């Protein structure tokens, strides 16, 4: 039976998808208008043959393509499960190709991704700047939940938060200021409670615990 082989190649495909998922995130963060992180760029390296100013994420772009090659081997492995009378050799020619291709490619991709992450350049100041561009909108969910916990219905809470959020979108207003100027919101929450919902540290309070769990060590 080749079902165990199919499960093996499916697992390789899932790992490849995770590699691509991480790679796409890095590629997005390296976009010129975002620039929250980027692949290491050595002196004299060319980022684009046509536009000298660019610093393209060539390694993670390569990893995206390699991930597709690994996943390409999953379907043939699934098709190999159906053999005549539990045994013929129609699977053999397939496995002789996808076996080496999938495993070697994935091994290379994992090594490359490890290197990319080890040398990844991070720009925390740009992360903060990008967050601040939205004038507090990223905290809308916490305000919504706080209103419901204060006894407001979810529908009413949503309306209160949304109308203030839309003024930020449409008029460039400050979200916290709009909430403090909304009499319906202020009847439920005070200024200190609103300000508390805008604390970015709330969203990263478990980071050390997560790293400790993943790496099985104290951070």
Where are these regions (language model features)?
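Internal glycine-rich alpha/beta core junctions
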Residues: 1-83
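Glycine-rich cofactor/substrate-binding loops
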Residues: 51-219
């Amino acid at each position: 039976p080749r079902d165990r082989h199919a499960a093996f190649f499916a697992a390789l495909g899932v790992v490849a998808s995770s590699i691509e998922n991480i790679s796409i995130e890095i590629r997005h963060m390296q976009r010129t208008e975002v620039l929250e992180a980027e692949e290491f760029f050595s002196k004299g390296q060319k980022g684009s043959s046509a536009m000298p100013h660019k610093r393209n994420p060539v390694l993670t772009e390569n990893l995206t393509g390699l991930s597709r090659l690994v996943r390409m081997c999953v379907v043939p492995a699934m098709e190999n499960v159906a053999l005549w009378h539990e045994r013929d050799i129609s699977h053999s020619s397939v496995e002789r190709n996808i076996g080496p291709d999938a495993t070697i490619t994935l091994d290379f991709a994992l090594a490359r991704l490890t290197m990319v992450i080890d040398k990844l350049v991070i720009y925390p100041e740009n992360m903060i700047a990008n967050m601040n561009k939205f004038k507090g909108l990223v905290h809308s969910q916490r305000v919504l939940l706080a209103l419901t916990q204060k006894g407001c219905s979810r529908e009413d809470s949503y309306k209160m938060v949304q109308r203030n959020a839309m003024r930020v979108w449409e008029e460039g207003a400050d979200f916290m200021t709009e909430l403090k100027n909304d009499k319906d919101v202020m009847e439920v929450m005070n200024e200190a409670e609103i300000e508390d919902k805008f604390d970015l540290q709330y969203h990263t309070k478990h980071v050390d615990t997560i790293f400790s769990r993943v790496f099985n060590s104290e951070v």
